[in-house]
Amino acid sequence: METELMRIGVSLPDTLLSKFDEIIEKRGYSSRSEGIRDAIRSYISYYEWMGDIKGHRVGTVAVIYDHTKRGLSNALADIQHHYSHLIKSSVHIHLDHDNCFEVVVLDGDGEEIKELAEAIMSLKGVKFSKLTTVASNEKI
């Protein structure tokens, strides 16, 4: 159980904070702090799940990014070329003038898939990224 609370400061774009405030109100949180604690717990849980990605996997990485960010499109292409042995397909959609949505379909070693996803997630200009995988040998 968490006992000691630490005060931190966070800088956010106003549109992101407005959306977060809407969610807090709809979910009935008593404060932004409670919403942030819940979001951090969810992030930690997802990160721990990513640590368990082992063996042969199939999955996707979904990414929304600002293609006007200098060097980002090239960095994404470099990552995809480096991990081309894992990539089976990709779909690229222009959302608006600045933003693109890309889904990359993957098949291969789970640890390498995780490396690819983390390389994409760490790039400046990536606004959203989500890795989803399943063990390819599971009986469905």
From Swiss-Prot:
Pfam family of the protein (one): RHH_1
Domain of life: Archaea
Cofactor note: Binds 1 nickel ion per subunit.
Cofactors (names): Ni(2+)
A GO biological-process term: response to nickel cation
Keywords from the named record: DNA-binding, Metal-binding, Nickel, Transcription, Transcription regulation
MF (Gene Ontology): DNA binding; DNA-binding transcription factor activity; nickel cation binding
Residues the entry annotates as binding Ni(2+): 81, 92, 94, 100
Signal peptide extent: none
Family indicated by similarity: Belongs to the transcriptional regulatory CopG/NikR family.
Function: Transcriptional regulator.
Protein name: Putative nickel-responsive regulator 2
Taxonomy of the source species: Archaea, Methanobacteriati, Methanobacteriota, Stenosarchaea group, Methanomicrobia
